[in-house]
Amino acid sequence: MTAASTTATTMLQATQSDVLQEIQSNFLLNSSIWVNIALAGVVILLFVAMGRDIESPRAKLIWVATMLVPLVSISSYAGLASGLTVGFLQMPPGHALAGQEVLSPWGRYLTWTFSTPMILLALGLLADTDIASLFTAITMDIGMCVTGLAAALITSSHLLRWVFYGISCAFFVAVLYVLLVQWPADAEAAGTSEIFGTLKILTVVLWLGYPILWALGSEGVALLSVGVTSWGYSGLDILAKYVFAFLLLRWVAANEGAVSGSGMSIGSGGAAPADD
Ligand code: RET
């Protein structure tokens, strides 16, 4: 065994306590995690209060999907804070940090698999879209997150990290297509186009920030440190999750009549029944 591989093995066998120590000694990284835990806690309480009078099934479904966003988030950040979903990865030859053990908060990519479908479910219900379109957006989104996780975790080949990044981007394009082309027309027909338009722009602009950060951060070309990258994601999360969800819930609570269908009209091709 060479000296380099011995060091690598040592770090790769780091215990959860070692990882925790490393997180806690990195102020930027640690604060980016704890600020989000605190915010998610406040947001959960706020959303419970905001949704307490919502009665119609479709509006309720939007509310539950929206509530799940900070609920998944607080669990995700608690996983990162404890070191459970953070590990050391030895970057492959060709990577800017080749041979070094880089702290990877991979749990983020894993938990996006659960939070981002909730954002899309809420948006799809708001637009009163059809089930095929909703299924497409959610499955493409899950594909994006899982292949993004693969891109972050691959240590055998630099090229394959970027191949998976490319696959993830292709899934992302499908999500963007649904959001930008299909759902605006559904929202127009459902009478929710104003709020949908605002949330669509917020979502598309902020979501584009994630692959850019990935590419610039330590997973990609390593122009940004682990702490700065983590604050980047945390900042995007605050806007793409809490601000997004707040705007959506505030609108739903004030305009329940506009989303008062059964919540099961999904599959009807977006057309609401006449007596809806
Ligand atoms: C990755 C890297 C690979 C390429 C692409 C990505 C996109 C990620 C996105 C994440 C959105 C996350 C949100 C989380 C809220 O809980 C995986 C970074 C395209 C769009 C909104």
Curated annotation (Swiss-Prot):
GO biological process entries: phototransduction
Topology, Cytoplasmic side: 52-57, 128-130, 181-192, 255-276
Pfam families: Bac_rhodopsin
Keywords, comma-separated and alphabetical: Cell membrane, Chromophore, Ion transport, Membrane, Photoreceptor protein, Receptor, Retinal protein, Sensory transduction, Transmembrane, Transmembrane helix, Transport
Listed InterPro entries: Arc/bac/fun_rhodopsins (IPR001425), Rhodopsin_retinal_BS (IPR018229)
Keyword Cell membrane: yes
Positions on the Extracellular side per record topology: 22-25, 82-105, 155-157, 217-225
Protein topology in the membrane: Multi-pass membrane protein
Residues annotated with N6-(retinylidene)lysine modification: K241
Residues that span the membrane, as ranges: 26-51, 58-81, 106-127, 131-154, 158-180, 193-216, 226-254
Taxonomy, superkingdom: Archaea
Subcellular location: Cell membrane
Main location: membrane
MF terms (GO), sorted A to Z: monoatomic ion channel activity; photoreceptor activity
Pro-piece positions: 1-21
CDD domains in the cross-refs: 7tm_Halorhodopsin
GO cellular component terms, semicolon-separated: plasma membrane
Function: Light-driven chloride pump.
PANTHER family for this protein: BACTERIORHODOPSIN _OPSIN, NOPA (EUROFUNG), PTHR28286
Name listed for the protein in its UniProt record: Halorhodopsin
Species this protein is from: Halobacterium halobium (strain port)
